[in-house]
């Protein structure tokens, strides 16, 4: 199998610039990895990462819900469009329904699976620390693929960790750590298709069923 690793290295650079199945959500909150609606703490657990299915792009929020998106797979060499190409540029309208925050946010998603149980989870992030962790993982994956391991094990097996640093104004800042502890062969399961992009919408109400159509959501 031949894999072009250039796309993964390109996306790693983008991440450093600061710029569907019913899968359980994995979240990193203030130094704690939390799984699912019950927010079970899973620091130190191990997962195989489907870096080859890394998904990223712009997600549009309204009143705490996804209302539009421009997403693509890294493996397809997808690069997010520039922010000014997405519309919603009038900051005065951001206050209504979005608390003054830009409704369009860059977000990245990494599918993970348990090698024993087969459980699938999805880690999504739009933070600087999360982007740095994913950038490092994409680079390590590209290096591994370029080395052409004879056993075909190109997916990183990671342990969920955490670190922190002291910010002069904001105090202690927690950042996620994805430590590579092993490598695994990719399963034969086909990659989920992407949803079709929706036409531009005004800053009005959320679309009820849009979030359910996003892969892994």
List the predicted regions and their residue ranges:
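Interfaces that engage single-stranded nucleic acids at replication/repair/recombination sites
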Residues: 191-217
């Amino acid at each position: 199998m031949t894999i072009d690793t250039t796309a993964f290295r390109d996306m790693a650079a983008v991440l450093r610039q600061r710029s569907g199945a019913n899968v359980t959500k994995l979240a990193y909150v203030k130094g704690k990895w939390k799984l699912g609606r019950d927010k079970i703490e899973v620091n130190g657990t191990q997962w195989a990462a489907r870096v080859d299915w890394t998904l990223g792009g712009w997600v549009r929020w309204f009143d705490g819900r996804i209302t539009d998106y421009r997403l693509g797979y890294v493996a397809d060499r997808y690069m997010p469009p520039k922010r000014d190409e997405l519309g919603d540029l009038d900051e005065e309208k951001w206050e209504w329904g979005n608390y003054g925050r830009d409704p369009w946010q860059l977000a990245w998603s990494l599918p993970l699976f348990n090698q024993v149980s087969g459980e699938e989870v999805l880690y999504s992030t739009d933070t600087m620390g999360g982007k740095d962790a994913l950038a490092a993982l994409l680079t390590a994956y590209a290096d591994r693929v370029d080395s052409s391991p004879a056993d075909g094990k190109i997916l990183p097996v990671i342990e969920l960790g955490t670190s922190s640093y002291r910010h002069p104004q904001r105090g202690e800042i927690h950042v996620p750590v994805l430590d590579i502890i092993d490598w695994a062969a990719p399963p034969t399961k086909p990659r989920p298709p992407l949803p079709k992009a929706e036409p531009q919408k005004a800053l009005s109400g959320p679309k009820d069923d849009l979030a359910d159509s996003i892969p892994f959501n």
